[in-house]
Amino acid sequence: MSIVVKNNIHWVGQRDWEVRDFHGTEYKTLRGSSYNSYLIREEKNVLIDTVDHKFSREFVQNLRNEIDLADIDYIVINHAEEDHAGALTELMAQIPDTPIYCTANAIDSINGHHHHPEWNFNVVKTGDTLDIGNGKQLIFVETPMLHWPDSMMTYLTGDAVLFSNDAFGQHYCDEHLFNDEVDQTELFEQCQRYYANILTPFSRLVTPKITEILGFNLPVDMIATSHGVVWRDNPTQIVELYLKWAADYQEDRITIFYDTMSNNTRMMADAIAQGIAETDPRVAVKIFNVARSDKNEILTNVFRSKGVLVGTSTMNNVMMPKIAGLVEEMTGLRFRNKRASAFGSHGWSGGAVDRLSTRLQDAGFEMSLSLKAKWRPDQDALELCREHGREIARQWALAPLPQSTVNTVVKEETSATTKSDLGPRMQCSVCQWIYDPAKGEPMQDVAPGTPWSEVPDNFLCPECSLGKDVFDELASEAK
């Protein structure tokens, strides 16, 4: 099935509702994706890109229903990755002499995937044009490392459509093709997720390349991406967002993520978050357990944040494997203008937190002091964690803190959360995890200061996932 994009331009791509992993398992496509291919019918017929290789036969069959394959005059490959040019082998088997227009680097990539050096390659550079009749031309713009060396964009004069390749796209599948037809909140989230996880390493290239394209002084009525929606309603809105995101982007937000073996590091994370919120209630704080969270959501939140706190238990004197892997990914993403602090618990011997601090510094973060706890933190240790959070809030504040929070918030919370007001702490009889009403359970939206009697019935123990019925009053507090 084809969709009219504009005039003689048709979408002939493929929706992929089921895909959940991209780039191996490095990117979770929780809302599917699409592989956008475009057929332009003027005096010359042009195909821009193909689809993912797993849809090769289906793509060629559908394309046959649109046009006699022998009538395709030119093929333009903006990017040689398999989700763009994957169907080339199947297509070229039918029309082996059709000229392929691409960058010089793309020839190496295409041959590396398809192994057909005999194909009719035509190298294009920035500013080169191709006349397709009816007074229209294709103008080519090289965009190396956005996000492969072979990448380029193609602009169609007359219709003023920019075929933008991966830039301005998103892994987002919907029966509707255009940006004004889909849920705007979902669309924004997927655009930001895509930029944060794929294009962040190349942010330094984004602004000059966009400036170069704008320097052509060409009107842009539509931006036709390689994945997700076609931007037809105010298409330059996504360009403005890219310029914003490329400028060492940060919000007044702190992300905390951790891994834990015995819940000790998790207790530290909660206490640190409480300290931050006490001192700077303006800052948004998000906590993630890496073992139970979507990795790409964590990285998107790091991208949005002014700083990140990373926690790990110590195992064999080093950090937990999932933390090590995620820090390695952050190193590759090359975040800028962000601060970091490491924390974690250990038993008879430490090592993980120091190692983690070094890795975060190597990843380009401006480091603050780290925090360690031995074994399960007691109330004194948790107060140190809260104080660490308060100090982080002060150090990382983007504006002067409200004086009331600096002077009185700790005293006010102490008086408001006495045991007589909130009732006893409760202990899970299975795993021994303790619910403290003064701290609540932020991961399940149970606010600090919530007595056990007011905790929702669907509450689950964060450690063993059993319900409220397995909890007993803590023995030391039972009367």
Swiss-Prot record:
Q: Which positions carry the signal peptide feature in this UniProt record?
A: none
Q: Which InterPro entries match?
A: Anaer_NO_rdtase_flvorubredoxin (IPR023957), Flavodoxin/NO_synth (IPR008254), Flavoprotein-like_sf (IPR029039), Metallo-B-lactamas (IPR001279), ODP_dom (IPR045761), RibonucZ/Hydroxyglut_hydro (IPR036866), Rubredoxin-like_dom (IPR024934), Rubredoxin-O_OxRdtase (IPR016440)
- The residues listed in the UniProt record as binding Fe cation 1, with positions renumbered to this chain, are 79, 81, 147, 166
Question: PROSITE patterns from the entry?
Answer: FLAVODOXIN_LIKE, RUBREDOXIN_LIKE
Main localization, broad class: cytoplasm
Q: Where is the Rubredoxin-like domain?
A: 423-474
Any idea which positions bind FMN? 260-264, 342-369
Which Pfam family would be a valid example here? Rubredoxin
Q: Per its Swiss-Prot or TrEMBL entry, what cofactor is needed?
A: Fe cation; FMN
Question: Binding residues for Fe cation 3, per the UniProt record?
Answer: 428, 431, 461, 464
Query: Which molecular function GO terms apply here?
Result: electron transfer activity; FMN binding; iron ion binding; nitric oxide reductase activity
Q: Where are the transmembrane segments?
A: none
Spans annotated as Zinc metallo-hydrolase: 30-210
Which pathway is this protein engaged in? Nitrogen metabolism; nitric oxide reduction
Q: Look up the record and report any one GO term of the cellular component aspect.
A: cytoplasm
Q: Which residues form the Flavodoxin-like domain?
A: 254-393
The places in or outside the cell where this protein is found are:
Cytoplasm
Q: What keywords appear on the UniProt entry?
A: Cytoplasm, Electron transport, Flavoprotein, FMN, Iron, Metal-binding, Oxidoreductase, Transport
Q: Where does Fe cation 2 bind?
A: 83, 166, 227
Q: How is the cofactor bound?
A: Binds 3 Fe cations per monomer.
Name the CDD domains for this protein.
Answer: flavodiiron_proteins_MBL-fold, rubredoxin
What the protein does?
Answer: Anaerobic nitric oxide reductase; uses NADH to detoxify nitric oxide (NO), protecting several 4Fe-4S NO-sensitive enzymes. Has at least 2 reductase partners, only one of which (NorW, flavorubredoxin reductase) has been identified. NO probably binds to the di-iron center; electrons enter from the NorW at rubredoxin and are transferred sequentially to the FMN center and the di-iron center. Also able to function as an aerobic oxygen reductase.
Question: Which family does this protein fall into?
Answer: In the N-terminal section; belongs to the zinc metallo-hydrolase group 3 family.
Q: How does it assemble?
A: Homotetramer.
Which named protein is this? Anaerobic nitric oxide reductase flavorubredoxin
Name of the gene: norV
